[in-house]
Amino acid sequence: GSEMCIRDSIRPDDIIKNYGADILRLWAASVDYRNDIKIGDNIVKQLSEIFKKTRNTARFLLGNLYDFDPAKDYVAYEDLKPLDKFALHKLNELIANVTEAFEAYEFYKYFQCLQNFAAVDLSAFYLDIVKDRLYTAGKKSLSRRACQTVLYEICSALNRILVPVMPHQAEDIWRNTPEAQKAGKPESIILSDWPTTNEKWNNPEIEADFTEILKLRETVTKAIEVLRGNKIVGSSLEVAVTVTGDKVALLNKYASELKSVFITSQATVSAQKPEDVLSEHSEHGYTAWVTKAKGHKCERCWKYSELSTEAGYLSLIH
């Protein structure tokens, strides 16, 4: 009731007044009730930041689905890029893990899974990489629609996963999704079904490959960060990367995707160290050599290319 307080320090109604009911519910879901339960101003503020990040992720998803019509633009799984398939594999894992956590009344695991997916799998990896496809690829190109298909599935599942703990935020998201505009869909997200895993998205081979790709990306990022720290380059798009390592077959398999994964203008697989190396780093069985990107900067995507500067080609890389 109104007189209830937690450790005589923070009143639940004060949390609701200052942060909203979803934050109080998020706190309840974040603690392991089998151990001592802690709460304080700093904890509530941290949860508020997590809430905002989740909201910003949802805003990014919705902002890039404004022109996506699932009935016309949805891309079949077989036509998705490997990175897209990896994202759906991680989404499948999230659905399975949070469902298991709820069924076992281990709500804190739900919180951990949700936070890791939003911060690590999405914001720090998938969404960071696909921005180029979303912003510069042709509006109805296969590349952009494939990415939108994944964002659509993520938004749909993530929205439902938010409902038990953050229903107000979930409702706000639902009202702006392409799915909610379909005829016959529930007026409220609360009336929709809980998400289920999709067997087609389960892809252990892709997961194994991208576990290594993530290690390679970390190696490359550390080499580039040295240049950023010394203010030799400002953006990763200003560099070209040459990589080598023990798993050459894997590197060659994804050679055409690497510049997108690294967010660099060029990426090459070669055991031969290039000339004019500005920075290098070795880790996880991989070595990355960083040089200045060759060519001229595209006005549209900011990538460097050796395409002719005549006839406006640099504005038409994508």
Where are these regions (language model features)?
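Short, small-residue-biased leader/transition segments that mark boundaries at the very start
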Residues: 1-6
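Catalytic adenosine-cofactor/nucleotide-binding cores of aminoacyl-tRNA synthetases and other
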Residues: 7-80, 179-185, 230-235
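Structured, non-catalytic alpha/beta "coupling" segments that mediate domain-domain communication
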Residues: 44-70, 164-178, 249-276
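Core structural elements
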Residues: 49-62, 84-93, 112-133
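Acidic, turn-prone loop/beta-hairpin segments
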Residues: 68-96, 128-223, 230-245, 271, ...
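Short cysteine-rich clusters marking metal-coordination/redox-active sites
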Residues: 298, 314-315
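Cys/His-coordinated zinc-binding microdomains
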Residues: 302-305
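Short, non-ligating residues that shape and space the ligands of small metal-coordination modules
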Residues: 307-310
